[in-house]
Amino acid sequence: ERPYNLVFKTIFPKDRDLITQKYYYSNNQLPENKGISATDHGLGNCTTHKTTVIQQETRRNNKLVSSSLTYFKGVVNSALKVPKEKYYAGPDGVMEKREEYPRYDVYGNPVEIVKDKHSTMVRLWSYQGMYPVAEIRNATYQQVEKALGTLAETLPGGWLSDQVWVTLNSNLRSSVYLKNALVTTYKYKPLVGIIEMIDPRGKSTYYDYDVHGRLKEIYIIEGGIKKLLQENEYKYYNEK
């Protein structure tokens, strides 16, 4: 039915053990998975995800090594299918939920990510959903929303102006709701790349590009002095 999908792969490493990988798609019957009872992967007969891998098994000499499974859900009026939960299993085959995605923005970008049931990270997007502009660890979306107010909702669809950039950093880094959070923020030149990154300590790293949009240098400012971290030089093949 879907001859373009990779179903089975065999690897012959140097130690001569036979490693096989099997892939399952929305039109396949999933194997029996220990530790979980739900069987609906959420894609159904979705025509836009025919090549999306739902589960992958890796075996060594036909013995299970690991397995990963993704459940999906619909966002943006259920028109867009995105990961809902990710499960992983070791050689015992018992699936454990390792990642959960409770919230997405209107562009289908993950906004809140929960790992291992307790480690929460919020990722905010802007530039009409094209780029992540903030990563807040050890915080929930509700806490971030309280810190930012209406900016949390308007940020994805806008363009990050200098004024919004200052407000975003100030609110995220000074809010009482985020006193235990680790905040990293990113500013971009659209269609070129990142131009500034501020780490959880409040230190900025800058990125500069040439007229062709290629990364020219990465630097920081220490004591008012520019300190290069990386410098790139581009030449044609025959250019000396």
What residues fall within each predicted segment?
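Beta-strand elements of repeat-based all-beta scaffolds
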Residues: 1-115, 119-199, 203-240
